[in-house]
Amino acid sequence: MEEAESQAVEKSEGYPLVLTVVVPARNEEDSIGACLESLVRQSEAGWELGREWEIVVVNDDSTDRTREIAAGFAGVTVLDAGEPEPGWTGKANAIQTGVRAARGRWLLFTDADTVHEPGHLSLAITEAERHEVGMLSYSPRQVVTGLVQRALMPLIFSELAVLYSPAKVNNPEHRMAAANGQFLLVRRDAYEKVGGHAAVMDAVLEDVALARIFKRRKLGLRFRYAPEAVSTRMYRSVGAMWQGWRKNLALLFGNPLTLAVWRVLDLVLLVGLPFAAWWVWEVARYGKGAYWTHYYGLVVLLIWVRTLWRFYRRVGRSHFPWGDVLLAPLGLPLFAALLYQSWFDHTVKKQVVWKGREYSGMKR
């Protein structure tokens, strides 16, 4: 980090530190160690942990070794959130607990499954100040393992990239707002002006809900893909991935059933068109008018190639490696099923489950 960049991040009157990093954590023993190690490594001359900035981990009633692991890091403050009050989600309650103890002019809310590259905390503040925004959110590089995750996750993130494109989100005149709670940096005065997480206490997607308030209040919002700054492994099992997206998809996409139908149509075309071309060629071999019928099969094949190209062009926007993108057709039936289940939970059952807690009648 250059000296000029360090000097650009200054303390402000009223808060003794530049930044407080708040890490809400519930049963994150598999990931919180790597997260905190990457955060502690940010400390360097001119940007020293405990002098310019701090880390606050909020243990959200974990039943594993999350608290013990966090407490083992020197310079890290560990708090206990306790059970949330009625009407509060666990994550919003944990973040609010951390904010009450925070001493920074800027607040970074980041998940316990993230890994941060050296030097990028102060650079993020510099970026937010340069763009004069009250909220800066990064979409991390996603780390996935196993066939199911590799086939499904690019589909989800490509849809998110199309719907919540940074060009729309970063345009103050456009109504679209988005943020990613895995890395959400806010200027404290702007955050307090909107009421903090108390304003989104019952929102299942509190990050997007908070971004919408910031944009509506014209406090400045910037959102972008930032693989150079942060990465995350969101899910360590297929079950956890299924439960997580089941909670979120119906909230992220306005018409999940319509989207499910379109993805099923993708599957039908990708699989069906080659068989249709083969069938036409078989008819051409044995039927009358074989010479002309042969070209009909070629037309069908060209339509399939065009469909395949458009499909991969769309999924390529997910920022996943092409090895994962190529597997995306295998994930289409799973994506459609997940969209349906998420719609059913939110619309019919009106209840979602996450990290052992049930939420009913919560805001979108």
Positions of predicted regions on the chain:
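Acidic donor-binding/catalytic loop of UDP-sugar-dependent glycosyltransferases
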Residues: R65, A112-E127
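Catalytic donor/gating beta->alpha subdomain of glycosyltransferases that bind UDP-sugars
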Residues: A128, M135-A161, D189-E192, H197-L259, ...
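Membrane-embedded multi-pass helical conduit in multi-pass membrane proteins
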Residues: R263-K349
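Long helical/loop segments within the catalytic core of UDP-sugar-dependent glycosyltransferases
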Residues: D80-R100, L123-K193, A198, L249, ...
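Acidic helix N-cap motif at the loop->helix transition within catalytic regions
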Residues: D30-A34, T63-G72, G119
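A conserved acidic beta->alpha catalytic loop
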Residues: S38, N59-E68, E83
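Cell-envelope/extracellular polymer assembly enzymes that use nucleotide-activated donors
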Residues: L17-T20, E54
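Short, acidic, metal-binding catalytic loop of nucleotide-sugar glycosyltransferases
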Residues: E37-E52
